[in-house]
């Protein structure tokens, strides 16, 4: 295991492995390795080019070559075989052996100066979500005095892709400010989003009392303590901070909608609970910074509620209102409209062919793979009761669950995926049901898990 780690840090380079001296704490600090890199590998580079290489070596992940601060030097580095390219030849990074050696030459102050230059660069260009995280990495690494506020800005909307970066970056910030209640609060929020119970519990213990309410609610859901969750919700409805009340009400309503299975009869208790949670939301007191995201979340909940109550006209109005919130909401509007199409299919208002065509178009328009798979999974669930063969054909178009993706949204998708698979694989039915139950519990969907446990026991 130690040899593998050393090999990884030296980029797997055979000569570097031979030159490695075990008396050094880090492989790249070996004098022989450093001399080899400087005197042989980088012998054709001048000081300015080495300075540019240092900047590229400080990037945390492969980046788009044209967006690099040192894009003018990429060609030179490539000719010298100093770079490692992604399979599509778009993203680039410095070969790991060279990167680690260049970093080892820099003291902490020099590294901070480079991070500062890079943060200024990334701040001044148009960025993707991933590049937002690169910017945040450099801002934290340069010791930016506003790092708490900068992290908070990124927490307004936590996507699955962002949560991976944020979890790491917040821990990095905590190494610099371990006593920061704000940072522990942010870490707990991301852990709740990723359904990471042990991490959530750890950080809750380091948060100021008045900010614990919403996180204790999330913890109760994730641990399957629905009665405790309801008690926590009721106790906090008179919270002095209306923003906290709004967040808890939106979260409770959304979870109640999601905590069910597709072939379950809609009961009045579910509808009454969702209406109760929605009634606690005061839109006039939504924080300006999160108002847009909160309005979208509320509209999505109301859209789901309208379909549960078979009010297709209301559902259409809600999907149109989401579309009016800007370009970023267009993909979400397609998701809502696809649910309306499926509703019409189940009520014999449109044909299967029309529905599949609409779903195919909606899926192809999505850039988020979780969204696209969720759209098709909705169709699979609708087809199972009356055309199991066609449902299976659509199911085969879905990606299999991936272990490295962590978010409550994705876990709910995976739980539904396993439930659907139980219908198509009779010999694996019990295994699929057990997996669906387990993932439903991970996502905090206790009611759905209990229903499936009853089914499992009846089969056994």
Which role fits each region the language model picked out?
Residues 115, 149-152, 164-174, 196-207, ...:
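Alpha-helical repeat scaffolds
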Residues 30-32, 41-50, 99-133, 144-167:
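A eukaryote-biased feature capturing mid-to-C-terminal, repeat/solenoid-rich segments of large proteins
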Residues 139, 191, 220-223, 260, ...:
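Residue at a conserved register position within TPR or TPR-like alpha-solenoid repeats
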Residues 35-105, 112-120:
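C-terminal boundary/linker of central alpha/beta nucleotide-binding cores
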Residues 400-460:
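C-terminal non-catalytic interaction modules
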Residues 1-2:
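Conserved small helical "lid"/interfacial subdomain of P-loop NTPases
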Residues 134, 186-189, 214-218, 222, ...:
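"A position-specific structural signal for the A-helix of alpha-solenoid helical repeats
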Residues 9-21:
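The conserved phosphate-sensing helix
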């Amino acid at each position: 295991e130690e040899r593998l780690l050393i090999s990884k840090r030296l980029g797997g380079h055979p000569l570097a492995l031979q030159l490695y001296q075990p008396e050094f704490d880090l492989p790249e600090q070996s004098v022989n390795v450093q001399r080899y890199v400087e005197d042989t590998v980088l012998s054709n580079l001048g000081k300015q080019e080495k300075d540019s290489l240092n900047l590229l070596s400080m990037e945390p992940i492969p980046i788009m070559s044209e967006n690099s601060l040192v894009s003018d030097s990429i060609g030179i580095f490539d000719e010298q075989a100093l770079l490692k390219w992604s399979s599509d030849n778009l993203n680039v990074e410095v070969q790991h052996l060279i990167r680690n050696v260049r970093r080892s030459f820099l003291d902490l102050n020099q590294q901070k100066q480079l991070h500062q230059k890079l943060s200024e660069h990334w701040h001044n260009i148009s960025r993707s979500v991933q590049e937002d995280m690169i910017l945040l990495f450099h801002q934290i690494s340069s010791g930016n005095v506003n790092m708490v506020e900068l992290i908070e800005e990124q927490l307004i909307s936590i996507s699955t892709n962002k949560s991976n970066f944020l979890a790491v970056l917040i821990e990095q910030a905590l190494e610099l400010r371990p006593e920061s209640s704000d940072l522990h609060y942010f870490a707990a929020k991301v852990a709740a989003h990723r359904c990471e119970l042990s991490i959530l519990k750890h950080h809750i213990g380091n948060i100021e009392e008045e900010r614990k309410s919403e996180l204790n609610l999330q913890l109760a859901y994730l641990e399957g303590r629905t009665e405790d969750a309801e008690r926590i919700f009721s106790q906090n409805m008179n919270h002095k901070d209306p923003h906290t009340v709004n967040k808890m009400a939106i979260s409770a309503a959304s979870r109640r909608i999601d905590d069910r299975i597709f072939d379950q009869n809609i009961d009045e208790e579910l509808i009454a609970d969702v209406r109760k949670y929605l009634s606690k939301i005061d839109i006039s007191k939504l924080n300006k910074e999160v108002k847009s995201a909160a309005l979208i979340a509320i509209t999505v909940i109301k859209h789901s509620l309208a379909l549960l109550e078979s009010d297709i006209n209301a559902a259409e109005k809600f999907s149109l209102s989401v579309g009016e919130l800007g370009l970023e909401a267009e993909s979400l509007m397609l998701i809502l409209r696809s649910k309306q199409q499926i509703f019409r299919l189940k009520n014999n208002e449109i044909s299967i062919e029309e529905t599949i065509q609409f779903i195919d178009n909606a899926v192809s328009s999505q850039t988020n793979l979780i969204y696209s798979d969720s759209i098709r999974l909705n169709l699979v669930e609708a087809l199972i009761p009356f055309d199991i063969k066609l449902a299976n054909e659509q199911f085969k178009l879905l990606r299999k669950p991936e272990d490295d993706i962590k978010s409550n949204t994705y876990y709910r998708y995976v739980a539904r995926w396993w439930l659907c698979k139980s219908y198509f694989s009779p010999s694996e039915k019990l295994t699929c049901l057990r997996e669906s139950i387990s993932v439903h519990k991970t996502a905090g969907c206790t009611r759905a898990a209990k229903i499936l446990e009853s089914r499992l026991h009846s089969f056994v």
